[in-house]
UniProtKB/Swiss-Prot annotation:
Residues 770-793 have a biased composition (Gly residues). It comes from Yarrowia lipolytica (strain CLIB 122 / E 150) (Yeast). Gene3D superfamilies: 2.30.30.30, NusG, N-terminal domain. InterPro entries: KOW (IPR005824), KOW_Spt5_1 (IPR041973), KOW_Spt5_2 (IPR041975), KOW_Spt5_3 (IPR041976), KOW_Spt5_4 (IPR041977), KOW_Spt5_5 (IPR041978), NGN-domain (IPR005100), NGN_dom_sf (IPR036735). Belongs to the SPT5 family. This is Transcription elongation factor SPT5. The gene is SPT5.
Length: 980
């Protein structure tokens, strides 16, 4: 350029240069655009091909640089440019003049003779071949190649959503903030968390923000909230000014417990909405059904509507301090009664409006209780309300019950639905809604169903039980498998969503139940039992009526009595159930015995025929397949078929077993002695009016009451609680004894006092049970000439080898002197005149009387006898100065002169030389003084002249015992005499 400027023509050359330079810039820009296009195409190819092309291009560039060192890069660009098309036609004249200039500039690429002709389009052909090969490749193969080539390069790239972090790196460490547990008032945990959140937000942009990271509470840890902070001071500042929290004793949670404390658990809480059914967890209304009326603003309390349980203060007793004590018995649920409240507890009753009252601080509207409960006391899961519970909320009409909402709440409980194999079901929710099928099997909450409708006909699918409901059609015969109408059967007459109306086979009434409680059956059945009573049981209705149960209903029984009348009674009104051994016996018109199970036919009237179910006196309860149960008189029937292979001829020949007519013998168990019959005085039974307790063997065991009426073996007892009259066998009673302050068995009560174990021995002192025995022979309390109950007769009995009292040839009762009651003895008995031994009252005798004795006794006045008399012994005994012979004075009217002890005989007794019974009295005792209760002759009971028994009841004058064994004073006793 500098040479041209020096030649003297700068302007034309400058213009040409400018034009050439502008053209060169345009072409350079276009070539760059082409290069960019080529680069874009090459970028679309794989990286390996791109590297190969770059290597080839570098080799070509090296060759071109050698050939054209003046323009190394333009050679590559000129291959893709049409140079001739870019030159302006106006400049054709200048081309010849300026060939050298153009050649020097190198704008036009001159073809090199050494370069081959195909070098210009080599790259074009290569590109075309590659594009054709790519187009011909299979798309699936190409995708595999791309995945293989580029998958390795992209696998190492980090993606935030696909990164996997080891679990141990998520565990808390010592570098994490600490968690502090703070005690608070139970039920205020959530409220305190909200207060801390508001305080944190309000102080966030202030000069002193709270330095806590988080605040939370757990439902499983009541009474605590937890704060996350770096130090304890930050927690104290955050809690400053809050109520219902106690920051004095904070708990630092250990690091190893962070995981359990912060583990997220799925909440099982059910959202409470007005109208939902719930149950209370505990308290007086624990387990009762309630309806949600409203929720409080803080969400901690809920207002419920429920049926109240009130006794209106009748079962509460006032204590010493005037406060009422609550009893443990919970009243039954009943609607509020304003009349009862005003009658029994008017002080706590206030009227707020029409049919609205406030009683004892609670609000009652329309008879229902409206009360606020803490939400923690409410259970909204598995409520499963029953229809009988819902009828309490609408006692007037059942149309008010929302069965649809009730069924919706029941679906939430999987345990409320029971599916069995063969049930026809329908899918009620999910993608298969409306599909019907048959249940094949069940496994927990999963039910396997074989579809019977399109588009899944024949396929088996597993579905959760909560998404299924049973499907029935009108006319199906079903059975109730749960609920209040359990085991009832009937015909479906109406369908409405999940509720089914059926006509019961038992009472021909329509009942409404849920479809989940039904099962399709073909048989007809029903409940045959209510409480303890079943169909055809024989029961006692009252004192005069018995009957047979002929029909069992839901809450009542149909009973046919002995008069042929059918009564409708409740189980609680039945007195008792009669057993087979309590039934009577009867004979037919031919005199044949009738037994239970025999088949008989009426001889008069309609001539009905049936089998004997029960027998009551002369009334038969018969059962016929076509007539049911009916009543007939025994003397108006004939036996057709006898039970137990008995024949009518044998029955007529032998007649009835009269031994079974006695209930005491017929009802006795084998090996058991029949209870004794009570002795009656003037037709009055002493058992009447007694306080008794019912013992084992009766269904009323443990109950107490008063005996009102009695028969030979049955007593009618009026119970204290419950207040009713029942029939009880006498031997099952325990009679209260006012004397002993204890209960006696019927056997003890019926046994006379003298014969009881505590009555004393015959002729001895009275025991604790009653008066002693003694008196005239024979007597119920003493012995006789025949050996009595305590003696062994001629064989020596207990206590003596010498024949004992009551039948010995020697004098009885251990006395050598003939004593009273010594009948049959060779020694003359009492009253025999002319005996060798002087009789009593004899003033003169060969044998010295009591006035003298060979062995002088202490204080004796010459009393003596070969046979020691009364009061005289070989060894001087005490008071030997007394008369030796019973009544041995010169005057018969004068008794003993000694006024000492009158009930004890001074003859040696307890250790007498003559063998005798233990503590046997040798001589009939007499009184010390001539009273009316003293007589030398043994007499009967209550006879003043004969030593008898002592009656503690004071029914007559006191009688001296024979022999007397004790004294109530301090006089010497009979058993105190020394051994001779």
């Amino acid at each position: 350029m500098s040479d041209r400027e020096e030649s003297g023509s700068p302007e034309p050359r400058s213009k040409i240069e400018e034009d050439l330079e502008s053209d060169e810039e345009v072409k350079t820009i276009k070539s760059e655009e082409v290069d960019k296009t080529q680069d874009n195409v090459e970028d679309e190819d794989d990286e390996e091909e791109e590297e190969e092309e770059e290597e080839e291009e570098e080799e070509d560039d090296d060759e071109e640089d050698v050939r054209q060192r003046k323009k190394p890069r333009r050679e590559r660009r000129n291959q893709f440019l049409d140079v001739e098309a870019e030159v302006d036609e106006d400049e054709e004249d200048l081309e010849e003049d300026e060939d050298g200039l153009i050649g020097e500039d190198g704008f036009v690429a001159e073809p090199d003779a050494d370069e081959p002709d195909a070098s210009d389009d080599r790259f074009h052909r290569e590109m075309d071949r590659r594009r054709e090969a790519i187009a011909e490749e299979d798309a699936e193969r190409l995708a595999d190649e791309y995945r293989e080539k580029y998958g390795r390069s992209t696998a190492n790239k980090y993606r935030g959503d696909s990164g996997v972090i080891p679990q141990h790196l998520l565990l808390p460490s010592v570098n994490e903030p600490s968690i502090w547990g703070i005690r608070c008032k139970p039920g205020k945990e959530k409220e305190l968390v909200r207060q801390c959140l508001r305080k944190k937000l309000s102080l966030q942009k202030s000069r002193n923000p709270l330095e806590i990271m988080s605040v939370f509470q757990r439902d499983t840890f009541t009474g605590y909230i937890y704060m996350e902070a770096r130090n304890q001071q930050a927690v104290t500042v955050a809690l400053k000014g809050l109520v219902n929290v106690y920051p004095q004793n904070m708990i630092l949670v250990p690091i190893k417990e962070y995981v359990d404390l912060l583990r997220a658990t799925k909440s099982a809480e059910t959202e409470l909405v007005p109208g939902a059914y719930v149950r209370l967890k505990r308290g007086k209304y624990g387990g009762d059904l309630a309806i949600v009326e409203n929720l409080s603003e803080n969400g901690l309390e809920v207002r419920l509507k429920l049926v109240p349980r009130l006794d209106y203060g009748r079962n509460a007793e006032a204590g010493i301090d005037g406060k009422r004590k609550r009893v443990a018995r919970i009243p039954p649920p009943r609607l509020f009664s304003e009349q009862e409240a005003s009658q029994y507890d008017p002080r706590n009753l206030q009227k707020r409006g029409p049919n609205a009252y406030v009683y004892a601080g609670d609000e009652y509207i329309g008879g229902f209780l409206y009360k606020d409960f803490k939400i923690t006391l409410v259970n909204a899961e598995n409520v499963a309300p029953k229809l009988e519970e819902l009828t309490r909320f609408n006692s007037e009409e059942t149309d008010g019950i929302d069965l649809a909402s009730l069924a919706q709440s029941l679906r939430k409980s999987a345990a409320a639905v029971q599916f069995q194999g063969g049930d026809v079901v329908e899918v009620s929710e999910g993608e298969q809604t409306g599909v019907q099928g048959t249940v094949i099997s069940t496994h927990g909450d999963i039910v396997t169903v074989e579809a019977t409708t399109a588009p899944l006909v024949g396929k088996r699918i597993d579905l959760p039980s909560r998404s299924l409901r049973k499907k029935f059609a009108i006319g199906d015969h079903v059975r109730v498998i749960s609920g209040n109408f359990l085991d009832d059967t009937g015909l479906i007459v109406g369908l409405e969503d999940d509720s089914v109306t059926l006509l019961s086979d038992l009472n021909k009434k329509e009942v409404t139940v849920f479809a989940k409680d039904l099962k399709k059956v073909s048989d007809i059945g029903g409940s045959h039992q209510v409480g303890d009573y079943e169909l055809h049981d024989f029961v006692q209705l009252d004192a005069l009526h018995v009957g047979c149960i002929v029909k069992v209903e839901r809450d009542s029984l149909k009973v046919l009595d002995q008069e042929g009348t059918v009564r409708s009674v409740t189980p609680s009104s039945i007195t008792m159930k009669l057993t087979r051994n309590m039934e009577g016996l009867a004979t037919d018109s031919n005199g044949s015995e009738i037994k239970i199970g025999d088949t008989v036919r009426e001889t008069v009237g309609e001539g009905r025929q049936g089998a004997v179910l029960h027998i009551y006196k002369n009334t038969l309860f018969l059962s016929s397949r076509s007539l049911g149960v009916f009543v007939a008189k025994a003397f108006k029937v004939n036996t057709i078929v006898a039970k137990g292979a008995r024949t009518q001829s044998n029955s007529q020949a032998t007649g009835p077993d009269l031994t079974k007519m006695n209930p005491a013998v017929y009802n006795a168990r084998p090996g058991q002695m029949a209870p004794p019959v009570m002795p009656k005085q003037g037709g009055f039974d002493r058992l009447k009016g007694k306080h008794v307790a019912i013992g084992p063997g009766s269904q009323h065991k443990g109950c107490k009451g008063i005996v009102k009426e009695t028969t030979d073996d049955i007593a009618r007892v009026e119970l204290h609680a419950p207040c009713k009259v029942v029939n009880v066998l006498k031997h099952q009673l325990r009679i209260y004894d006012d004397y002993k302050k204890t209960y006696l068995s019927y056997m003890e009560f019926a046994t006379p006092r003298g014969m009881r174990s505590g009555g004393g021995r015959p002729g001895g002192p009275p025991g604790p049970g009653g008066p002693g025995s003694g008196g005239q022979t024979p007597s119920w309390g003493g012995g006789g000439k025949t050996p009595s109950w305590g003696a062994g007769g001629k064989t020596p009995s207990w206590g003596s080898k010498t024949p004992s009292w009551g039948g010995a040839k020697t004098s009885s009762w251990g006395s050598r002197t003939p004593a009273a009651n010594a009948g049959g003895a060779q020694t003359p008995a009492w009253g025999a005149m002319g005996n060798k031994t002087p009789s009593w009252g004899a003033s003169e005798s060969r044998t010295p009387a009591w006035g003298g004795a060979k062995t002088p006794a202490w204080g004796a006045a010459g009393a003596g006898s070969k046979t020691p008399a009364f009061g005289v012994a070989r060894t001087p005994s005490w008071k030997s100065s007394s008369a030796g012979t019973y009544g041995g004075s010169s005057s018969r009217n004068k008794g003993w002169e000694d006024l000492g002890s009158g009930n004890s005989a001074p003859t040696p007794g307890y250790a007498a030389a003559t063998p005798g019974e233990m503590m046997g009295a040798p001589t009939p005792g007499a009184a010390h003084h001539p009273w009316e209760d003293s007589a030398p002759t043994p007499a009967a009971y209550n006879d003043a002249r004969t030593p008898g028994v002592y009656d503690p009841r004071g029914s007559g004058p006191a009688q001296a015992e024979t022999p007397a064994a004790w004294s109530t004073d301090d006089a010497p006793r009979y058993d105190d005499s020394p051994t001779p």
